[in-house]
């Protein structure tokens, strides 16, 4: 059974700005995530350390420094929460984007509970 992939509007905007080659890499990795779900591991997915969310992970399109932070919910969905290219700011990228992803995930879950 395939997993549903939801895309936060800010991530959707980011995707639109990618080159064709980058976009193809991201889509291929998203397709693998949809097919395999939480069992998809390295090199495509890695767990994020230092997050308040135990299930926060990063999608790692092969051969690139692009990263997409995402989390699974209890309804078999992965939500892409924050994205970017960490090549220009390798360590600070996570310091900036982990809190953004956490906040978006909590907001979406609160919204879905209503």
Task: Name these PLM-found stretches.
Residues 1-65, 74-78, 85-114:
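Basic, Lys/Arg-enriched alpha-helical interface segments
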